[in-house]
Amino acid sequence: PFDSKADYRTKVTLPGVELEQKPSVIEQFAYSDTWSDGTASYLAMITPRLVLMRELLADTGSIYVHLDWHVGHYVKLVMDEVFGKRNFRNEIVWHYSGWNKQLQSSFEKRHDTLFLYGKSDLQYFASYFEKWESKEEYVKKRKQKIHFESDGRDYVLSDAGNGERIKRYLDEVMLEGVVVDDVWHIDKLNNSAKESVGYSTQKTKELLRRVLQASC
């Protein structure tokens, strides 16, 4: 639901013919960010839709709203009212790589935002795990000393709480993976990507995979 200022006319090219379909009244309402009132019209459009989504959402359900810096901070306030501040779960940062330019008055904008809310305290959620690339990566990030059993099997000592330490064998750690936090490093699609459909705010399969596995 981006405030994209986009032109939503549809162009269809047939052999020897090019057709252009202007948006209907319904489409203009659905994308009222193209109206003269700008952000105010956009918020007037999205607010009743968020209310409807909340009504349709199961008590165990979650909602992820994908936005960028244009209106994210405004929509967050709307979602706090619609879903309740207590049901806010995360502001997920979708960070993607790119060629950074040296700007005169700001840093390069290199992320989008996904606001995650639950419908209620009954919300279903499962942590998402990524595989470690190597044992070396694990040791470097965890800054843990490697120990060895008499048979050569390597392990680390992890904090188990109450001052106790437990053995964690590295082969098991590698299989388990690392739990993902609220900063997701996933590159955006370029036009040559196989999964690209040419839609400017298309989500990648990897991003959708995380959403589905965490909340379904």
Residue ranges of predicted features:
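Core catalytic lobe of class I
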Residues: 1-216
